Amino acid sequence: MDQKLSKLVEELTTSGEPRLNPEKMKELKKICKSSEEQLSRAYRLLIAQLTQEHAEIRLSAFQIVEELFVRSHQFRMLVVSNFQEFLELTLGTDPAQPLPPPREAAQRLRQATTRAVEGWNEKFGEAYKKLALGYHFLRHNKKVDFQDTNARSLAERKREEEKQKHLDKIYQERASQAEREMQEMSGEIESCLTEVESCFRLLVPFDFDPNPETESLGMASGMSDALRSSCAGQVGPCRSGTPDPRDGEQPCCSRDLPASAGHPRAGGGAQPSQTATGDPSDEDEDSDLEEFVRSHGLGSHKYTLDVELCSEGLKVQENEDNLALIHAARDTLKLIRNKFLPAVCSWIQRFTRVGTHGGCLKRAIDLKAELELVLRKYKELDIEPEGGERRRTEALGDAEEDEDDEDFVEVPEKEGYEPHIPDHLRPEYGLEAAPEKDTVVRCLRTRTRMDEEVSDPTSAAAQLRQLRDHLPPPSSASPSRALPEPQEAQKLAAERARAPVVPYGVDLHYWGQELPTAGKIVKSDSQHRFWKPSEVEEEVVNADISEMLRSRHITFAGKFEPVQHWCRAPRPDGRLCERQDRLKCPFHGKIVPRDDEGRPLDPEDRAREQRRQLQKQERPEWQDPELMRDVEAATGQDLGSSRYSGKGRGKKRRYPSLTNLKAQADTARARIGRKVFAKAAVRRVVAAMNRMDQKKHEKFSNQFNYALN
């Protein structure tokens, strides 16, 4: 009974499941009901499992405790008698002993313990004084918030509050820094916006100011807005007689028309009092308005006109007149896109994260809207040409060349003049055939250069010519140097083809020469930097060096012999292996002589083959270790693949269902750590450091100032 109880507790607590197995839990309850001794033993086993450094084991053990606590008075007495230790193991009330990993299971354990203790106090708090005191201790001393869904302790809440305060402080500092940056850069941004707006107004003389009612880029003209306002019969102050300075830059179709309330064809509405008075200035304005409307063919204010501008017509064509403006606009827009707009977006993000600096946030949002509006204008105007600066430069250069060419006067060519006479017509003109131009020029250059070198007495050509003058004239060819017969020539060619060819080396350089200084080394007895002995230094002859200058090492790998045999081991499909390896087949091992059916000819090889077949028959094909490992990884069950592993079993986990705490998370830091701190990498680093120390020791070991380090 005791062994069965221990086995049930171990299986339930090490299952790793979020819920307990109902059948095993039913058996455990049945054993605990049998006697108080078994109940006490179950309590001790559960407390032992609660001390394990694994949160999943503690969670399962607490679930068993919760099931038994509400059903047995004796079990409640055992738990309440050691209630403080129970809370430390399940709730983590001791900051020095936090709950073990994994973190998710520890969080579930803390939440379950908080709910259970609160429920136990409501049901059994009056009957068990220690339980009520423990609940009071948790609420008032440990400051456990039972309404908190995360069931955090006081220490955890303090840590999180400190962490949040630290983050708030960092965000506040960043927001203050952003505010200072905005104060410093606002003037620069405003001047940049003013500059690019001025460039746009000079490039395209339309009013591109954003309309407060719409977000268009000024596609609709101001004329339609004025007509709509006059049609609605709105009464407002007219424009003064002084013209707007911007009216001169606008076309006549987009000029704002002053509202005329006294026009007889205008819509209904109250007439202003100024109209009743016979002011001559008002009459002049009315007459000017009527004349302006009639001259443009409008005739009335009771209808509106929508002027649509083609988007293709807004693209700026680059020429010499607007080249400087386009360059300035391009530079400014590049500055906005690469510097100002990212900075403004960063300011908005910092101000939004802090929640304060409302005025700064509003100002940053306005700046962002203005910058984005400018970029949209740039995109619609398409002021950047496709050809780039190189094409513009070439065009300007061609224009300058054309201007320079205009200074010359064109003279007509003479009739019948031939600047070049073809080769086939040269005899008709009484001229000789022209030699190859390139050959003549090349020969002249070579001859001129040789003459110059010979005339220089310090040159090698002059010295060579001097030696040739002193040498006797060459004698006639000897009979031995006569041309050989065809048979001798063939024999000589065959011998030359059979003769080995070796690269040029030191041995050929000193071939047949006596080397008086070969292998001699000057040996000095004193190694001091300043004091030298007065006697003559000795010379030591090294025979190895002399031999190196007269000999050569030639590696003879032998003659290549192709493989003539096959593996001929039987394959699963019934055919024989046709690999031609020299000694060993990578699939069937050492190559041995076999007959036509694949059986080894040597009796020892045949016996070894039979033993291997018997071992293979003992293990079915479905028990392939690789296949079983794949199935185990997919199902989580142990199928015994380690028993068939040929390289050793390895260390088996005791509870494979639990989360492996030793397994590292597959993060970039962990992967880099595995590569950097691998045993082979550490050995390489240690070996390299040892070599560096050895070189330093060999170089400075005899100097006293380095010997102390």
UniProtKB/Swiss-Prot annotation:
- Ranges of Low complexity composition bias in the record: 477-486
Renumbered residue ranges of the record's region Disordered? 1-20, 230-289, 386-406, 469-495, 588-655
Q: Which residues carry this modification: Phosphoserine?
A: S281, S287
| Gene3D superfamilies, A to Z | 1.25.40.90
Q: Name one GO molecular function term.
A: RNA polymerase II complex binding
Which cellular component, as a GO term, is one annotated location? nucleus
Q: Where is this region: VHS-like?
A: 2-145
**What GO biological process, any one, is recorded here?**
transcription-coupled nucleotide-excision repair
Compositional bias of type Acidic residues: which residue ranges? 280-289, 397-406
Coiled-coil ranges from the UniProt annotation: 165-199
UniProtKB keywords: Chromosome, Coiled coil, Disease variant, DNA damage, DNA repair, Isopeptide bond, Metal-binding, Phosphoprotein, Ubl conjugation, Zinc, Zinc-finger
Q: Tell me which Pfam families the record gives.
A: DUF2043 (PF09740), UVSSA_N (PF20867)
How is the polypeptide modified once translated? Monoubiquitinated at Lys-414 in response to transcription stress; this promotes efficient transfer of TFIIH to stalled RNA polymerase II.
Compositional bias per record (Basic residues), positions renumbered to this chain: 646-655
Cellular location(s):
Chromosome
In which domain of life is the source organism classified?
A: Eukaryota
Q: Where is this cross-link: Glycyl lysine isopeptide (Lys-Gly) (interchain with G-Cter in ubiquitin)?
A: K414
Q: Which residues fall in a compositionally biased region of kind Basic and acidic residues?
A: 1-10, 386-395, 592-632
Sites binding Zn(2+) sit at C567, C577, C585, H588
Question: In which family does this protein belong, per the annotation?
Answer: Belongs to the UVSSA family.
**Disease (UniProt):** UV-sensitive syndrome 3: An autosomal recessive disorder characterized by cutaneous photosensitivity and slight dyspigmentation, without an increased risk of skin tumors.
Q: What does this protein do?
A: Factor involved in transcription-coupled nucleotide excision repair (TC-NER), a mechanism that rapidly removes RNA polymerase II-blocking lesions from the transcribed strand of active genes. Acts as a key adapter that promotes recruitment of factors involved in TC-NER. Facilitates the ubiquitination of the elongating form of RNA polymerase II (RNA pol IIo) at DNA damage sites, thereby promoting RNA pol IIo backtracking and access by the TC-NER machinery to lesion sites.
Q: What is this protein called?
A: UV-stimulated scaffold protein A
Question: What is the native source organism of this protein?
Answer: Homo sapiens
